Amino acid sequence: MRNMHTNRRSPGPITSAATQRRLKPEPEPTVKKFIKIILLSRIIEKMMKVPARFVRFGPKLTDNVTLQTPVGFKRSIRIKRIGDEVWFEKGWSEFAEAHSLSDGHFLFFHYEGDSCFRVVIFDVSASEIEYPLDDTDDNREEVMDDDEQGFTGFESSDDDGEVVDMDELLKKKKKKPRVNIKSENVIILD
């Protein structure tokens, strides 16, 4: 008898449709950006709701996300899930306070992958804010010059003693009044 040779390949392992779906990489999210307008009620609650459409069609978020501003300020934010809703919770109020967010500010969120968002912040005049240099900005001490004649800069309490020249810093940044919200009172500091 002659040895018959066929061109048919032997079938590979048979997998179920459910297994095939699990093996496919997660599709690219269709929604990667959203805008939020800051409301006084949300500042008081110390949480911010992520838009439902972003939650539904955007990337799957881990329990912690990172918010990063254009100057490199980063803050880790804990996610709270309530039913189908997703909220920025723990760490959000610190982020809001560090950037002096108040009623009427709006934020542009751009998802960059790996549970990280780039955040651009606009004030009530629709102008981008001046960002704090980093999240350790509050750990600074005033430095007086040798003659005690006046303020010359800031010295960070956690660095190697480098002094920041305020004249140089002010040339780079235009000084704006900061707004702090205490309960429902708005106080403008010069």
Swiss-Prot record:
Localization of this protein: Nucleus
GO molecular function (one): DNA binding
Region (Disordered): 1-27
InterPro entries named among the record's database cross-references: B3_DNA-bd, DNA-bd_pseudobarrel_sf, Plant_B3_domain
Keywords, ordered alphabetically: DNA-binding, Nucleus, Transcription, Transcription regulation
Pfam families (alphabetical): B3
Location of the DNA-binding region in this protein: 33-125
Domain of life of the source: Eukaryota
GO CC annotations on file: nucleus
Name listed for the protein in its UniProt record: B3 domain-containing protein At1g49475
Species, as recorded: Arabidopsis thaliana (Mouse-ear cress)
Taxonomy of the source species: Eukaryota, Viridiplantae, Streptophyta, Embryophyta, Tracheophyta
